[in-house]
UniProtKB/Swiss-Prot annotation:
Entry PTM: Activated by phosphorylation.
Taxonomic path: Bacteria, Pseudomonadati, Pseudomonadota, Gammaproteobacteria, Candidatus Pseudothioglobaceae
PANTHER family, per database record: PHOSPHOGLUCOMUTASE (ALPHA-D-GLUCOSE-1,6-BISPHOSPHATE-DEPENDENT), PHOSPHOHEXOSE MUTASE
Listed EC numbers: 5.4.2.10
Function description: Catalyzes the conversion of glucosamine-6-phosphate to glucosamine-1-phosphate.
Protein name per Swiss-Prot or TrEMBL: Phosphoglucosamine mutase
Gene: glmM
Organism of derivation: Vesicomyosocius okutanii subsp. Calyptogena okutanii (strain HA)
Amino acid sequence: MDNYFGTDGIRGKVGIEPITADFFLKLGWSVGSVLAQQGKASVIIGKDTRISGYLFESALEAGFLSAGVDVGLLGPMPTPAVAYLTQTYNANAGVVISASHNHFQDNGVKFFSAKGLKFSSQDQSAIENKLTKPMINVGADKIGKAYRHEQPLGRYIEFCKSTFDRTQSLLGLNIIIDCANGATYHIARSVFSELGANIHIINNTPDGFNINERCGATNTKHLQQVVLELKADLGIAFDGDGDRLIMVDENGELVDGDELIFIIAKAWQSQGRLVNNTVVGTKMSNLGMRYALRDLNIQFIEVNVGDRFVMEQMQKSGSILGGEGSGHIICLNKTTSGDGMISALQVLEVLVKSQSSLTQLKQSMNKYTQILINIKIQTQVNLENHTKLQQAQLEVEKMLGSEGRVVIRASGTESLIRIMVEAKNKIIAKKGAKKLSNVFK
């Protein structure tokens, strides 16, 4: 049986299996058939702004209908909005057509349960098993119905605003927002301006091809430049589907996911709101954040890379805060998935209440330098049996001593080997990363 699901749903190049119309048709039928085993079912489908979303939306819709499942179409919608709306519309599942921070040539799909949580490993296995079966349509009298939901944007906008302390206001704050020409393009202004902020939006004119193109959470140069040019208080960058958040301080410096998690954790602990006094992160989480949390007697729990694994551990440990340096931040007391919009509001609430700048808020954490290198691969590489790589890693770890570390892993969403060298000293980190990447040349 093929394993189609990676760490964040199914993703790949458009037109190459499994990102094809015929596969998505079969996928819709497979998921629908699994859901229909519990009785009459309905799903909602949202998508980001890439051009191929229209193709795959129609294919999934047809697959669900052929399994007897009703389909509510949302149109362009952030991933976390679909997670929320799945619950408010009382759907059995939510579907997002997106490749997150990737460019328009890629696409993919993610699924949420009726509770707004990403499908479990067991759910994914049931779907993959159904994909091996012949596609048998329901009878003509049992075909599902399709319809378009009215005003889903308004519901999500009001929900986002409700997570911000309404005794506070963003009045007087000048904020630049980069929507990555993605799914937040028609939402971000309303959320932040209605809470009082002066908003300047960039990269909010999607054309189907410019999603994440030199913009958004994975490419913040434009945002940093505009923050400085307009002398803004801060900048906010989302990725293509709105589940990631990176911020820029008033000096044009990046504030990444680990720093933002620390800012929230410190504030919530001081207010007695950090349930179980724990934060969940991944093996890529910055050492500086770990040490800063330790100094506050906040427990840090490490899991594998992927916000699904972070969420699973948060549920096990009773934690309400977790995430990744890439900007996936989960505030489980506010919502059920990583949500860039809601995470930004939590940081802004801390900023307003403390009357501090973003630069001041991040000073309590001394971030280590992380040098990240992605190595493209054509065929699968067995990292455990790669003698040259292991030897190079030993040499780099000896060079780092107790002042750093090495993480090498295969990407769960792309054909890449990801190398990360972390150290207090930037020069040493760069030297170590170069040595490891040279193994693949």
